[in-house]
């Protein structure tokens, strides 16, 4: 069977609060690891750290890529425009953990909203 990369999170964040209970993302990662598929995870949450053990296993056999979006360096503003997700600082810390685990990451600066977070100060702060 030809292998490919599976992806989750392109339309909505897979690590919603309910995921703490149902653990569907973890189950999907386990299946990907068992069958030898790579995995791309797109999230604004640091909750994926719960599954770091499986992400490392997948990355050893095939490849894992974690993509995260950064919107603003202002933590209070982040909490207002992106409630219920990890703050920029928490995401940055999670990205450092992934780097230390040799897991490739992609960072998106998005959305860039005119007159809201498109300032030079914000972009340099991120």
Predicted features along the sequence, with ranges:
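Conserved AdoMet/S-adenosylmethionine-binding subsite of the radical SAM
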Residues: 1-126
């Amino acid at each position: 069977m030809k292998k490919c990369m599976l992806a989750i999170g392109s339309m909505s964040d897979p690590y919603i609060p309910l995921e703490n209970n149902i653990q569907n993302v973890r189950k999907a990662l386990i299946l990907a690891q068992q069958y030898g598929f790579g995995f791309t995870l797109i999230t604004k949450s640091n909750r994926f750290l719960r599954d770091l053990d499986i992400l490392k296993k997948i990355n050893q056999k095939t490849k894992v890529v974690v993509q995260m979006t950064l919107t603003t360096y202002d933590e209070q503003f982040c909490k207002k425009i992106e409630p219920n997700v990890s703050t920029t600082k928490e995401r940055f810390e999670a990205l450092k953990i992934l780097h230390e685990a040799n897991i490739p990451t992609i960072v998106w600066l998005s959305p860039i909203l005119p007159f809201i977070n498109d300032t030079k100060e914000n972009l340099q702060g991120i």
